[in-house]
């Protein structure tokens, strides 16, 4: 018996050691490239559909590689400065390249509260078009080989290389995150020194921003989604006055997305998952998602069952009267009555959006994040 237990214990320890060894070998701790190091080559797809490597920039005296992304509020705060940097130094033989290092698998919806887009390749194309990026915007989120080779600590993180592609500067764009306060002083000083052939006075700085979303660090995402799945889903009755109060939004201090729907409405059911995603993106901000079911009270159990399947842990109501026209007038006298119907109401009652039909999820996210009560930056 003791011998059997000993054999089992040895086998268990071997399994733990083997698993740990494999994990460490597969997922090394990324190390930031050191000053004086040669630029590692890469082969990455740009949002323009072209492949890029170091040789793509052979004609440039200075190569600036910036690891950044769509979703991070700090990265977004620096977008315009990186655009200006690119335009200002293009004629001086400086090439700016931006690489998105993040794995989509490790990026969860709660981390998208300051953006309208995630970090997928398709969303990168949309952001580049929306902002008019004048630089190559490359995707490394699939294998993250380039990010591992360079070791960015956060987004954004800048690497400046001379004509021999030796690293001369590694660090921040500047020390003032808020748009309008900084002009990219740190990276501009570094580029100017490299162009002049002189040593960069401050070759390394710390960086501030969002951590890189490594593909193997997705435990928190799985845990968060499980927590969301376990949140209680409720359905309460609401009367005419209650609906009017919701639309007035007098004291919540939150931007309200109000959706009127029904279980028998095909478009309502079709768009509902997108509304849940939007709620999960922005529920950590001054935002709340509210649904009002136009189903009859006799179908209350069916409504709740649908909401539970959707994991709709937001505020959910069902109109408590038989006369649906009272509900229509309470929501919006201008509403014709067709479902779905969606409102976005600022704190204080200003309606900034209303639509009788399905929403466009991408447009809705942009509307929300660019509202004065939400915003893209800290």
PLM features: what roles do these ranges have?
Residues 61-63, 68-71, 254-256, 261-264, ...:
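Short pre-active-site segment immediately N-terminal to redox-active cysteine/selenocysteine motifs
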């Amino acid at each position: 018996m003791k011998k059997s237990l000993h054999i089992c214990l040895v086998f268990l320890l071997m399994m733990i050691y083997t698993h740990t060894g494999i994990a460490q070998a597969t997922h090394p701790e990324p190390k930031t490239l050191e000053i004086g190091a040669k630029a590692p080559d890469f082969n990455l797809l740009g949002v323009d559909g072209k492949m890029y490597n170091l040789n793509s920039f052979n004609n440039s005296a200075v190569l600036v590689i910036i690891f950044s992304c769509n979703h991070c509020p700090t990265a977004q705060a620096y977008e315009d400065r990186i655009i200006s940097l690119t335009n200002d130094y293009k004629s001086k033989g400086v090439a700016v390249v931006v690489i998105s290092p993040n794995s989509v698998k490790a990026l969860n919806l709660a981390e998208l509260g300051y953006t309208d887009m995630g970090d997928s390749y398709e969303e990168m194309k949309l952001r580049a078009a929306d902002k008019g990026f004048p630089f190559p915007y490359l995707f490394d989120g699939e294998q993250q080989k380039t990010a591992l080779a360079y070791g960015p600590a956060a987004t954004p993180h800048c690497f400046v290389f001379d004509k021999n592609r030796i690293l001369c500067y590694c660090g921040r764009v500047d020390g003032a995150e808020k748009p309008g306060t900084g002009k990219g002083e740190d990276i501009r000083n570094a580029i100017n020194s490299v162009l002049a052939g002189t040593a960069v006075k401050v070759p390394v700085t710390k960086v501030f921003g969002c951590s890189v979303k490594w593909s193997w660090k997705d435990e928190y995402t799985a845990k968060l989604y499980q927590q969301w799945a376990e949140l209680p889903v409720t359905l309460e009755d609401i009367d005419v006055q209650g609906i009017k109060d919701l639309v007035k939004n007098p004291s919540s201090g939150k931007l309200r997305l109000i959706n009127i729907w029904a279980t028998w409405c095909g478009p309502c059911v079709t768009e509902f998952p997108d509304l849940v995603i939007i709620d999960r993106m922005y529920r950590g901000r001054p935002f709340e998602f509210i649904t009002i079911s136009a189903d009859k009270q006799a179908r209350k159990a069916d409504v709740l069952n649908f909401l539970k399947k959707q994991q709709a842990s937001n505020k959910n109501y069902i109109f408590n009267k038989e006369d649906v026209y009272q509900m229509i007038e309470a929501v919006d006298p201008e509403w014709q009555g067709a479902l779905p119907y969606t409102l976005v109401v600022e704190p204080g009652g200003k309606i900034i959006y209303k639509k009788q039909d399905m929403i466009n999820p991408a447009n809705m996210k942009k509307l929300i994040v660019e509202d004065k009560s939400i915003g893209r930056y800290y």
